[in-house]
Design a protein with these regions (language model features):
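Charge-rich, acidic-biased intrinsically disordered regions
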Residues: 76-88, 112-122
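Immediate flanking context of iron-sulfur cluster ligation sites
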Residues: 42-59, 80-89
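Amphipathic alpha-helical segments within well-ordered protein domains
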Residues: 34-35, 52, 69-73
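Short cysteine clusters
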Residues: 61-64
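Acidic, glycine/proline-rich low-complexity segments that act as flexible tails and inter-domain linkers
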Residues: 1-47, 100-122
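C-terminal structural segments of small proteins and small subunits
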Residues: 83-108
């Protein structure tokens, strides 16, 4: 079953409101951090939301996806622009996996030869 993104966004807003009541400084700090990157407005709201969507996908954050999809649409992002941003996210994830694969090979090289030869015979 597909997620009802509009309902999910409402549930998130209610949850964040509750956190804000319990810990207002947490929400205040988040809002200050969130607005800090927007002060110069060099990228524009639509571009910031497209970047946020790409990051949301790489972080696998459903809450981020629902909030930033709505915001991207509100700021004029087209379906094609969103798809391109998601393509960038997919490529970065694949690139990161490839880069981290080299770390596995480095780790393998550090194991004693006796251990690595036992593993290769298994």
């Amino acid at each position: 079953m597909m997620l009802d993104w509009n309902e999910y966004r409402k549930q998130l807003a209610a949850g964040v409101k509750e956190i804000g009541q319990l810990s207002p400084d947490t929400i205040k700090g988040y809002m200050e951090l969130s607005s800090a990157g927007q002060k110069k407005n060099l990228l524009g709201a639509k571009m910031r939301e497209l970047i946020a969507l790409a990051v949301a996908v790489t972080l696998r954050c459903d809450g981020c996806i629902t909030v930033h999809t709505e915001a991207a649409i509100r700021h004029g992002a087209s379906k094609d622009e969103i798809a391109e941003a998601l393509g960038v996210a997919a490529a970065v994830n694949a690139g990161a996996a490839l880069v981290y694969s080299t770390r596995v090979m480095d780790a393998f090289k550090e194991y004693p030869r006796a251990v690595s030869s036992q593993v290769s015979r298994a």
